[in-house]
């Protein structure tokens, strides 16, 4: 990651030197646009477009605009690009503690992986899975857990009902759904209690919701729930590993997708949190910790809740302001435990487990090189509770839970690492922004609508694969086209 930061600062230094040379009347470097109509420097601007956020959405938008001739500056608050992707080195191997997976129906992800010369590996799913349903542990193969037959029937009918309803919610404008106000007036738990009427099934669905959204059904608008499921291809595709949204992961870590785009994205400043955006006539000025920059347009790609912490002048319209105030972020703690052996495989287990009470999910995260690893998510309300506890107490809970499912050998990992996304000051949570009842139907149209010269992107604004890395890339493509249609290219 240090090399990427060096490249970033070198590019920024080069841009400053180029501007200084022009101000002194020097010749433009070869390949630089000549001053003239459409050149931002004629009007004293630093760039055509400023992008706030150096994650997948921001860098995708920036490189698309740079490729069409726009001068672009990316301002990333953290010390490295990546957004909600984060790859760390543990025991000499690289692991993702942020966004990780891709799957069928994600063309932009696979195109970018190929473009950057990266590769993927399938998520390990051979062997039996574990379901900890309200304290009762069972193992099963395939998609169907070993539960009471009546519970299984209710669950299958419930999933069918959910998928049938989510297909009625438009991907582009869920607030235009004929039943939008009705569904946005209740929580996902309200609907489940009225329609599933089985505590075990409700517990299983809530367990899935915690993983997908990082929150509980009681906090989630049913309209938002349905829209997200429709965008992701339905309930089963969102929770499945094999042939689902968790089908494969990037060898060497997903953050490489962001670092690989840096050389294509114009000038990128890290350690530059944005504090204020001012619109003044035909320009915008953006105040960051790395200085103030001016441009014709600004694209904000940070999480919705984080965008609410930026000061805007003039203030945002009521619709946009009310939406951002209501958006929350999911709570997710991602934990890695490395071992000398894949002992769970030797016992015929896949490494996958779900607990409805503990709020945990596990996967086999063993590297292609053979470094044995178990990955655990602590999600939803349990994650918020554990975030407040001492680190050693949290570690003990994680290892006790792994022992509960995989045996005493899980108690002594060779390496242990956790990442609490709610504690990340420039992310605020994971995996996605969530909306309580009464938000999408009333304020949803402000989600993607530009505010003057301010444009919005980020995975939550995507039409397909909302909340996934694919959705972030889609939103970057969409906002780049939006800006290109309005800004004249030199």
What function would you assign to each model-found segment?
Residues 110-131, 199-206, 343-350, 411:
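A short alpha-helix-loop-beta-strand transition element characteristic
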Residues 47-74:
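N-terminal Rossmann-like FAD-binding beta1-loop-alpha1 element of flavoenzymes
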Residues 83-109, 166-177, 227-237:
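Glycine-rich active-site loop/strand segments that organize a redox cofactor
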Residues 66-90:
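Glycine-rich FAD pyrophosphate-binding loop
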Residues 2-38, 141, 234, 283-285, ...:
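Conserved flavin/dinucleotide-binding core of flavoenzymes
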Residues 93-165:
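Dinucleotide-binding Rossmann-like beta1-alpha1 core, especially the glycine-rich loop
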Residues 272-281, 286-346:
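Central helical "cap/lid" subdomain
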Residues 170-273, 280-283, 301-305, 311, ...:
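Active-site/ligand-binding neighborhood in enzyme catalytic cores
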């Amino acid at each position: 990651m240090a090399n990427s930061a060096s490249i970033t600062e070198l590019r920024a230094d080069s841009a400053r030197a180029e501007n200084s040379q022009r101000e002194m009347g020097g010749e433009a470097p070869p390949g630089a646009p000549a001053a003239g109509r459409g050149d931002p420097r004629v009007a004293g601007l630093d760039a055509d477009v400023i992008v706030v956020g150096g994650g997948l959405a921001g860098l995708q938008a920036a490189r698309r605009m740079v490729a069409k001739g726009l001068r672009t500056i990316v301002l990333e608050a953290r010390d490295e690009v990546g957004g909600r992707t984060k790859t760390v080195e543990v025991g000499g191997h690289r692991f993702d503690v942020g966004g990780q997976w891709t799957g069928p129906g994600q063309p932009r992800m696979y195109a970018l992986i190929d473009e950057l010369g990266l590769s993927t590996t399938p998520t390990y799913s051979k062997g039996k899975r574990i379901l900890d349903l309200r304290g009762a542990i069972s193992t099963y193969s395939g998609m169907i857990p070993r539960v009471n037959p009546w519970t299984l029937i209710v669950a299958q009918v419930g999933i069918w009902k959910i998928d049938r309803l989510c297909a009625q919610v438009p991907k582009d404008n869920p607030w235009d759904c004929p039943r939008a106000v009705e569904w946005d007036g209740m929580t996902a738990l309200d609907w489940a209690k009225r329609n599933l009427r089985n505590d075990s099934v409700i517990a299983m669905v809530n367990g899935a919701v915690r993983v997908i959204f990082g929150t509980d059904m009681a906090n989630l608008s049913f309209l938002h729930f349905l829209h997200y499921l429709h965008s992701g291809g339905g309930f089963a595709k969102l929770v499945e590993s094999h042939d689902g949204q968790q089908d494969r992961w990037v060898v060497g870590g997903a953050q490489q997708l962001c670092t690989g785009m840096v050389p294509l994205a114009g000038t990128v400043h890290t350690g530059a949190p944005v504090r204020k955006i001012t619109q003044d006539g035909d320009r915008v000025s953006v105040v960051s910790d790395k200085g103030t920059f001016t441009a014709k347009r600004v694209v904000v790609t940070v999480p919705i809740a984080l965008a609410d912490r930026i000061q805007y002048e003039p203030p945002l319209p009521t619709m946009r302001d009310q939406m951002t105030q209501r958006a929350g972020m999911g709570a997710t703690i991602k934990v890695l435990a490395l071992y000398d052996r894949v002992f769970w495989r030797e016992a015929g287990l896949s490494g996958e487990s779900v607990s409805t009470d503990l709020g945990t999910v596990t996967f086999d995260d063993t590297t292609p090189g053979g470094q044995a690893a178990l990955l655990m998510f602590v999600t939803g309300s349990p994650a918020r509770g554990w975030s407040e506890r001492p680190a050693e107490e949290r570690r003990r809970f994680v290892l006790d839970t792994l022992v509960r499912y995989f045996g005493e050998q899980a108690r002594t990992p060779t390496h242990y690492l956790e990442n609490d996304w709610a504690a990340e000051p420039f992310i605020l949570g994971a995996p996605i922004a969530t909306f309580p009842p009464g938000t999408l139907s009333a304020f949803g149209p402000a989600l993607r609508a530009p505010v003057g010269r301010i444009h919005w992107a980020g995975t939550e604004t995507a039409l397909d694969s909302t909340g996934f890395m694919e959705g972030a890339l889609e939103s970057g493509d969409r906002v780049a086209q939006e800006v290109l249609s309005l800004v004249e290219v030199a």
